[in-house]
Regions:
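Short, Lys/Arg-enriched anionic-surface-contact patches
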Residues: 18-42, 67
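Solvent-exposed, charged helical/coil patches
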Residues: 1-8
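DNA major-groove recognition helix of helix-turn-helix
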Residues: 50, 75-76, 83
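Helix-turn-helix/homeodomain-like alpha-helical modules used for DNA recognition
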Residues: 113-120
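Short, basic interhelical loop/turn and adjoining N-cap
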Residues: 56-58, 62-75
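Short, amphipathic alpha-helical "recognition" segments used to contact nucleic acids or chromatin
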Residues: 39-55
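Short Lys/Arg-enriched helix C-cap and helix-to-coil transition segments
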Residues: 83-110
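N-terminal positioning helix adjacent to the helix-turn-helix/winged-helix DNA-binding module
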Residues: 9, 13, 41-42
Length: 120
């Protein structure tokens, strides 16, 4: 059950990245291109796997075909540095998180609405 939920979340995350960076799903899950938009989409996906789903760098290759663990570590560090340096990258990350976890956010907000509506 847990694995199914994770795969659904990853699919939603990939869809958000496809929309944000105007790339195909295969561009996110395969290391076949070094075009900027595709690299950024993979960088966000790599960081999302590591940060939100606690996937170790050595297992990232199971989610992004052809990615070596050293590349995963490099991309994680690069994204963290860019988020500290550039507000636009940090804002893109926040936007991505919102859309990647939209269903959870929507469910959480409806719970809060119910609590405020029925609890004094």
């Amino acid at each position: 059950m847990q694995q199914i939920k994770m795969e659904e979340k990853l699919k939603q995350a990939r869809f958000a990245l496809m929309t944000m960076f105007e790339v195909l799903e295969k561009d996110i899950i395969q290391m076949k291109s070094r075009k900027q938009k595709k690299v950024y989409a993979r960088m966000f996906y790599n960081y999302y796997l590591w940060e939100k789903h606690k996937v170790p760098h050595v297992h990232i290759k199971n989610y992004i075909e052809g990615m070596h663990h050293a590349t995963s570590i490099y991309l994680k560090n690069k994204l963290e540095t860019e988020m500290k340096q550039y507000d636009s990258v940090a804002m893109e990350w926040q936007t991505f998180l919102f859309f990647a976890d939209y269903q959870d956010w929507k469910q959480q907000s409806s719970i809060k609405e119910m609590q405020t509506k029925y609890i004094i």
